[in-house]
Amino acid sequence: MKKLLAAAAVAALALTGCASGGNTETTSDDNTFVVGMECAYAPFNWKTSEETDTSVPLGSSGYADGYDVRVAQYIADELGMDLEIKTISWDGLLPALDSGEIDAVIAGMTANEEREQGADFTTPYYDSEGMIMIVRKDSEEATYTDIQQFSGKNVVGQKGTNYDDVIDQIQGVNHVTPKQQYGEMIVALQQGDVDGITAEMAVAEGVIAANPDLTVVQFDEGKGFEADTTVSIALKEGTRDSDSSKKFRKL
């Protein structure tokens, strides 16, 4: 939790620099911190009909909750601003940031070379236990210990994410067209349309808890995927070079 809040503090200061002369402009009033997320990626962010101590209203359509919502609320509190969560599809998040529709993307997003061409990222606020595979519990794949055993199998990942990119590390895999959300992939797995779903452990634990017919394949050391599994906050390009942001990174 300390690591989470420290990273949130960095982002808060970066945004303070933005508010005092940076280039971020949003459609909301100056006292509202607008954050974009899918609200479909538990435990990082999800939509619920029930209000909790950590949830944030989504207009008249329920509430946003999760790890990312807590980070967003912390930053808003540090800035002395109101928090507004906008539900945006994964592939629309960075365009919304660039256009000024939102102030930040806090959505379980990993910084990579392509994304850094159009946005600035804070230091990571989360590092997962690594990338794994979700499979049917009663399947042969549940006994696998090496990603190469999925050669010839149908494997799917979420569109526009590292989880889709890494599938090609499996030689001879049938790389299924990626899906927008995990819900679609889970249905495909349960119906036998795919043999495995790439994911990180934090996400997989929630999937398994809700779907006891599924299980997780954790690979032996040196036999798994090679991927960056850290999560950072995306800010509008140029924000991270502000003087206030540089001061915060010394904390």
Name every feature range the model reports, one short phrase each.
Residues 82-149:
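Acidic, polar ligand-binding/catalytic clefts
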Residues 25-109:
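Extracytoplasmic small-molecule ligand-binding "clamshell" domains
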Residues 19-22:
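Bacterial signal peptide processing site
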Residues 34-35, 54-65, 146-161, 175:
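Short loop->beta-strand "edge-of-pocket" segments that line small-molecule binding or catalytic clefts
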Residues 67-69, 85-95, 142, 177-191, ...:
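Short helix-initiation/N-cap motifs at beta->coil->alpha
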Residues 92, 109-118, 166-169, 195-227:
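A ligand-binding cleft/hinge motif common to bilobed small-molecule-binding domains
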Residues 12-17:
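C-terminal motif of bacterial Sec signal peptides marking the signal peptidase cleavage site
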Residues 127-135, 209-249:
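Periplasmic-binding protein-like
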